[in-house]
A protein has these predicted regions:
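Helix-to-loop junction immediately C-terminal to a conserved catalytic motif
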Residues: 48
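Conserved ABC ATPase "signature" region
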Residues: 86, 90, 97-115
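Conserved ABC ATPase signature
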Residues: 119-123
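Catalytic Walker B motif of ABC-type/P-loop ATPase nucleotide-binding domains
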Residues: 144-147
Length: 303
């Protein structure tokens, strides 16, 4: 449905996208994950035809049959929910009776059926996104694109929104969604990591985990400020990152199961041995490693 071939986009000297190659097929729920400034919104603006790439190509087979939920709420705040949907239907030439029936079904699906007369400007962030989703679905698209739809939304609304997306995908809709939240990737059938305009890796969650080439150890300690610098000095360790209340210790290339006794010896007398264990990498671990590898490769090319 969407194919990007060496896709690049620059704004002056800033490279928002750098040589992105990606294919998204019919029936997928694809999550594009990356921090602010990664290039996610630029990717969507090109996919929806709002801007042209600087070089490379993007082909969107559903350009005339797509729904789009932008990052910022783009409906009329001085119109009610019902009025916004009626206006959207009129703009796209949807029959009035058909539009009314679809709107009722959509609002019931997202839990807004009791609020049809409420002005959009009076809605909470989560309710605004549900309205934006309903507006995007009003034309029964073949492809749904959503640019960070849950950013700034409370946790309960986030969960409800993703439940709705999961139901839509189960019904056969192809969905492409961007998010800065790693935990939301579990909802997707396939994931892409985007960082500073570079597509670092793609795959299912399990494929990405299996592709992780390093040994990873978790250290649980209440004295992380003392533990972290000590580990960072060990040659067989190339990264020590804080994940919530624990440390993830990444072995250098070629370091395998011997990482655990190395960590235990380094932290002897400071951390109990049973507080040190090998773990499966999280998506954030995988993202960080791929970003580090891309930075190293770029440095080598520059040199």
């Amino acid at each position: 449905m969407i194919t990007a071939d060496n896709l690049s986009k620059s704004f002056g000297s800033h490279e928002a996208l750098r040589g992105v190659n990606l294919t998204i097929s019919k029936g997928e729920m694809f999550a594009l994950i990356g921090p602010d400034g990664a290039g996610k919104s630029t990717f969507f603006r090109i996919a929806t035809g709002l801007i042209e790439p600087t070089s490379g190509m993007m082909k969107n087979e559903c350009l005339q049959s797509q729904g789009f939920v932008p990052q910022r709420f783009a409906l009329y705040t001085d119109l009610s929910i019902d009025e916004n949907l009626a206006l959207r239907a009129q703009f796209y030439g949807v029959d009035r009776a058909v539009a009314k029936r679809r709107a009722a079904d959509l609002l019931s699906r997202v839990g807004l059926d009791r609020f049809g007369s409420r002005l959009a400007g009076q809605l909470s962030g989560g309710m605004k996104q549900k309205l934006a989703l309903s507006a995007a679905l009003l034309i029964t698209p073949s492809l749904l694109l959503l640019d960070e739809p849950t950013t700034g939304v409370d946790p309960l609304s986030r969960r409800e929104f993703w439940t709705t997306l999961h139901q839509l995908h189960h019904d056969g809709l192809t969905i492409v969604v961007s998010t800065p939240y790693m935990d939301e990737a579990s909802y997707a059938t396939r994931i892409g990591f985007l960082d500073r305009g570079r597509l670092l890796a793609t795959g299912t969650r399990q494929e990405l985990i299996r592709s992780y080439p390093r040994t990873l150890v978790e250290v649980r300690s209440s004295d992380r400020q003392a533990v972290r610098p000590r580990l960072s000095q060990v040659p067989q360790i190339d990264d020590v990152s804080l994940f919530g209340t624990v440390l993830h210790v990444r072995g250098a290339a070629g370091v395998g199961s011997e990482l655990i006794p190395i960590v235990q010896q380094t932290l002897a007398g400071l951390v109990a041995q049973d507080a040190i264990a090998a773990i499966e990498p999280s998506l954030e671990d995988i993202f960080v490693l791929n970003g580090d590898a891309a930075d190293e490769a770029a440095g080598e090319r520059a040199a």
